[in-house]
Amino acid sequence: LIGFYYLKMLQGAAHVDRFVALAPSVNGTSIAKTPNRDLVEYCLACADQHPRSALLRELKTGAITMPGVQYSVLVTKNDKVVVPVENQFVKEPGVQNIYIQDLLPGKRVSHSGMLYDTETLDLIVKLVQGQSIRTASN
């Protein structure tokens, strides 16, 4: 969410050509709805992940994406943090929403594991460099 917030709310789009988001909670996560006070105290940002949080309402006023920035969203079907997984996609024109498993069939990578997985990191580099990424669906 921080990257989307920077680009839109802090005028960061003037400084960014390509943005790659990993498993973003742009539409919230059902885990944030868990009425577990201990979780909220441990994870202060979890309240912002609630689908109806003030942060998400502010971010989603109008388009999330900004003109002039190429957006890619990388998602793993194995995510157990931002659920349902489809909530991670930005459903706006020009956004390339990608399941890692569409590029790497059978790939087992978790939400946090995306940060350490060399094949995922290679995909990020290609996207940042503007290289074409072909999925089974395009």
What are these regions (language model features)?
Residues L1-N138:
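Lipid deacylating catalytic domains
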